[in-house]
UniProtKB/Swiss-Prot annotation:
Cofactor: Mg(2+)
Protein name: Pyrophosphatase PpaX
Function: Hydrolyzes pyrophosphate formed during P-Ser-HPr dephosphorylation by HPrK/P. Might play a role in controlling the intracellular pyrophosphate pool.
Species whose genome carries this gene: Bacillus cereus (strain B4264)
Keyword annotations: Hydrolase, Magnesium
């Protein structure tokens, strides 16, 4: 079966938001729990939804903490977000070759659009599914299924690319092929444990992988 659709996670995959996310968590947690959290403590929070993360810390302050996180994240977005090399060129080439491309993310739409505009990727994506569009987040298959439906694509014709186990397991649950990115903050070995079909050392690795898959 030929692959004609590529779905991407956003944070840590298409754009480098690691410092923005870590700083947003530390700001929020230090506001409510001064000096209790260090950088390494918040790394496991990258990937799950904000609601899932903050509800495990204090169920009574979830909405307050989400509001605090999002305000800091919004205010410091452009200064802390960086590009990954070969991402722009690769996505542009996928579009040129006629692939359907979409984004599946657990972020809110407003900050998703900020990141896409900052990185100039906003012109390429046919579909963007955010946490605002679904009841369940990755690794539940719903967000991927929604993106595939909007793209008029079949799971067996799609590849999910991401930097977290939520992306890989989400793709597996939805029936797509999966590609993990080795630049994940959690480390290559962490993602290899979830058995993605492919491991990318740079985003441009996607192009020969897709070419080979569609030739066989």
């Amino acid at each position: 079966m030929r692959i004609n659709t590529v779905l991407f996670d956003l944070d840590g995959t298409l754009i480098n938001t690691n410092e923005l996310i870590i700083s947003s968590f530390l700001h929020t947690l230090n506001t409510y729990y001064p000096n209790q959290y260090k950088r390494e403590d918040v790394l496991p929070f990258i990937g799950p939804s904000l609601h899932d993360t903050f509800s495990k810390i204090d169920e009574n302050k979830v909405e307050e903490m989400i509001t605090s996180y999002r305000k800091f994240n919004h205010d410091h977005h452009d200064e802390l977000v960086e590009e990954y090399e070969t991402v722009y060129e690769t996505v542009r080439e996928l579009k040129r070759q006629g692939y359907k491309v979409g984004i599946v993310t657990t972020k809110a739409r407003q900050t998703v659009e900020m990141g896409l505009q900052l990185s100039k990727l906003d012109e390429f994506f046919d579909v963007v599914v955010t946490i605002d569009d679904v009841e369940n987040v990755k690794p539940h298959p719903e967000p991927l299924q929604k993106a595939l439906e909007l793209l008029d694509a079949k799971p067996e014709e799609a590849l999910m690319v991401g930097d977290n186990h939520h992306d890989i397991v989400g793709g597996q649950n939805a029936g797509t092929k999966t590609a993990a990115v080795s630049w994940t903050l959690k480390g290559r070995a962490y993602l290899e444990a979830y058995k993605p079909d492919f491991m990318l050392d740079k985003m441009s690795d996607l192009l020969p992988i897709l070419s080979n898959m569609n030739r066989s």
